[in-house]
């Protein structure tokens, strides 16, 4: 359980490691630590650690990239936080099922990547269309992830798989 707390803290720290990108917002390292939580702690403990991080943010501890509090559930980006929990689980589960190798760690990370974006994009669609009354199609939301988010997170998958391989 100590490791769960440590990874919850690492995900929180990752939210504040913000890399500015010209003409865009910023890029954080949260996803990197979410992947490592699943790869190193396994499915259950990885999901618990990321779930603790999300729970702390929802009760008001300002550990999300843009603060904290229960109102965060109405932000279009909250779906990615939900996706992080499932991603840590899926990444850990795939890692547990496959033989230890960089290729398999990368496969586990990519499974987490797909889960994070699937949940995040659908949640953003629901919040924008039904809560914020800002019409947006799933396609437009998906395409809005390409300039920075998806390529950057793909690189984080490569790095996390390499880091996990070096821990073995």
Task: Please name every model-derived segment.
Residues 1-49, 59:
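Hydrophobic transmembrane alpha-helices
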Residues 2-6, 13, 71-118:
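Short helix-perturbing small/polar motifs within transmembrane alpha-helices
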Residues 11, 15, 49, 57, ...:
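Alpha-helical transmembrane segments of multipass membrane proteins
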Residues 15-26, 54-87:
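Interfacial aromatic-anchored transmembrane helix boundaries in multi-pass membrane proteins
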Residues 46-50, 105, 141:
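Alpha-helical transmembrane segments and their helix-entry boundary regions
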Residues 61-66, 124-143:
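Interfacial helix-loop-helix junctions of multi-pass membrane proteins
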Residues 78, 138-159:
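Individual transmembrane alpha-helices with interfacial aromatic-anchor signatures
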Residues 167-168:
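Conserved small/polar residues in nucleotide/adenosyl-binding loops
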């Amino acid at each position: 359980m100590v490791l769960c707390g440590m990874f919850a803290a690492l995900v929180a720290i990752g939210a504040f490691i913000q890399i500015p990108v010209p003409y865009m917002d910023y890029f954080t390292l949260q996803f990197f630590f979410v992947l490592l939580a699943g790869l190193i702690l396994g499915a259950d403990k990885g999901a618990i650690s990321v779930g603790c991080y999300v729970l702390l943010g929802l009760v008001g501890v300002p550990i999300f990239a843009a603060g904290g509090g229960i109102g965060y559930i109405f932000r279009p980006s909250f779906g990615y936080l939900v996706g992080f929990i499932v991603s840590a689980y899926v990444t850990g589960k795939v890692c547990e099922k496959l033989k230890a190798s960089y290729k398999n760690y990368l496969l586990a990370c990519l499974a987490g990547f797909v889960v994070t974006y699937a949940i995040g994009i659908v949640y953003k669609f629901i919040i924008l269309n039904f809560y914020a009354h800002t019409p947006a199609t799933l396609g437009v939301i998906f395409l809005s992830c390409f300039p920075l988010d998806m390529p950057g997170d793909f690189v984080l998958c490569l790095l996390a798989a390499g880091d996990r391989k070096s821990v073995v």
